[in-house]
């Protein structure tokens, strides 16, 4: 099986080329790389046009910033290979974890694999207490409605069989994608596995974008997508 690596980015000029190089160098099967620039204003789009466009499977440009969910929607639609994996453009997740992430799919045990930043033995950067508590609360609430036992619903690393992710309509434009896709996967009764990975988190000074407003939106999305008929 081959990989489609989807890289949504917004104002990631400082790290994007390193991420692309890391994805290319990572162990694992043949892959295509699809980058979606979501209306960046820091020169990311110019960087892509000058140094990247034409060297990857696809580079997609959004004229205005719409959010991570919108960027992923564009990327998923463009994917052509059997396994689709999300790679954030900020170096918080290490492409060296690809083999572990996709192995349950290769073994025909899973249709979807979530990573977990809170299980396993890989390095994990120590950061914000309240961010961790909020993540735990959102995962707990999501699990209550989905009847799953995930340890890290809000994680950015997810791998899918292509036919699974392309069959699901993604409605959320921002970080509400995580609880939305979790609810829809649970309703679809897909086989979901979880794998512990390394996590090299950023501070807000280093460019981390998710905030408390996204947390409240996540609660709304948990209710919306689990309770809606």
Give names to the regions the model predicted.
Residues 14-18, 42-50:
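Acidic helix N-cap motif at the loop->helix transition within catalytic regions
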Residues 2-4, 32, 180:
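Cell-envelope/extracellular polymer assembly enzymes that use nucleotide-activated donors
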Residues 37-46, 91:
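A conserved acidic beta->alpha catalytic loop
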Residues 64-78, 83, 95-175, 200-212, ...:
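Acceptor/aglycone-binding surface of glycosyltransferases and processive sugar-polymer synthases
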Residues 1-22:
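N-proximal low-complexity "stem/linker" segments adjacent to membrane-targeting elements
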Residues 21-30:
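Short, acidic, metal-binding catalytic loop of nucleotide-sugar glycosyltransferases
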């Amino acid at each position: 099986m081959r990989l489609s690596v989807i890289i949504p980015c917004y104002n990631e000029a400082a790290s994007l080329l390193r991420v692309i190089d890391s994805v290319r160098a990572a162990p694992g099967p043949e892959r295509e790389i699809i980058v979606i620039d979501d209306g960046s204003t820091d020169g990311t789009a110019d960087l892509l046009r000058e140094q990247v466009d034409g060297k990857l499977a696809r580079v997609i440009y959004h004229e205005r910033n719409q959010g991570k969910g919108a960027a992923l929607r564009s990327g998923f639609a463009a994917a052509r290979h059997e396994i689709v994996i999300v790679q954030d453009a900020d170096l918080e997740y290490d492409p060296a974890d690809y083999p572990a992430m996709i192995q349950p799919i290769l073994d025909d045990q899973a249709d979807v694999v979530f990573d977990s930043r809170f299980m396993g033995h890989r390095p994990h950067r120590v950061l914000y207490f309240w961010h961790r508590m909020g993540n735990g609360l959102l995962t707990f609430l999501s699990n209550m409605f989905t009847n799953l036992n995930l340890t890290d619903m809000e994680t950015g690393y997810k791998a899918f069989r292509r036919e699974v992710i392309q069959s699901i309509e993604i409605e959320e434009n921002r970080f509400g994608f995580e609880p939305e896709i979790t609810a829809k996967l649970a309703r679809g009764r897909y086989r979901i596995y979880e794998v512990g990975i390394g996590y090299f988190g950023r501070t807000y000074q280093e460019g981390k974008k998710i905030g408390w407003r996204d947390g409240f939106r996540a609660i709304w999305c948990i209710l919306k997508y689990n309770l809606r008929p």
